[in-house]
Amino acid sequence: MLRIAIQAKGRLNEDTMALLADAGIDVAQSKRKLIARAKGFPIEVLYLRDDDIPQAVHMGVADVGIVGLNEVAERGMAVDEVMRLGFGACRISLAIPREVDYPGLQWFEDRTVATSYPHVLRQFFADKGIHADIHEIAGSVEIAPAVGMADAIFDIVSSGGTLVQNGLREVEEVFYSEAALIARQGLDDDKLADIEKLKFRFNSIVNSRGYKYVLMNIPTALVDQAVQIVPAMRSPTILPLAAEGWCSMHVVIAEDVLWEKVERLKELGAEGILVLNLENMIP
């Protein structure tokens, strides 16, 4: 049985629980329990703080974990990245007071930078040949320049709204992060096999994101033209209807071109077009 470490609460916990549910893994949540047994897969769930997950996986307290890559990079623990999960996306960036002119990275030479990610920042500055005073603080990093604690900050940025509210602007994106499935190194073959099964389920969900399943009725004589518009993953499914001269066409279409394709199919002569969500897509 695998043991997986996930964030105990917060947005990452919500997204992780949704992923597990979509993968057919039912986990009973309780605020009082740190460990829960799951149904639908041989796995036990360990609830931790996100910054403790890389260490828990590295030490073997958990076999696998779901955590942001920013935490993996900051903790510097030797773990394997199994796959990226497509949620929890953010970037860690350098930001300075809005009114300050910014000539480039050399601006940070001999400056004080406040951050909760000193390891990542120290490595970045070392690679760029910048010497700066890195001041580690646990929270509310964005207020550091305003209270005279630092000249700049290095912190997580999602929309940038928090920076604007605190009179800051982003000047250098240093690290891109998203949630990932990580694993302990040196696991036995049985656990590696279970991880592959878990990865298979997660991949089917991640692969389905950004796609829609589209069904339509179309005159048989127009099928070849319709296939040119939507070639699908390999080829659309074409089924004859009871009405003579008509077919039902089933196809997977990427969301970013969905409406353009549907409009062209409608103009061609398709009728009764249904657009459905995809839960899983297995190549």
Describe the role of every protein-language-model region.
Residues M1-P42, V67-D80, R84-R91, E99-P283:
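Small-molecule-sensing regulatory modules
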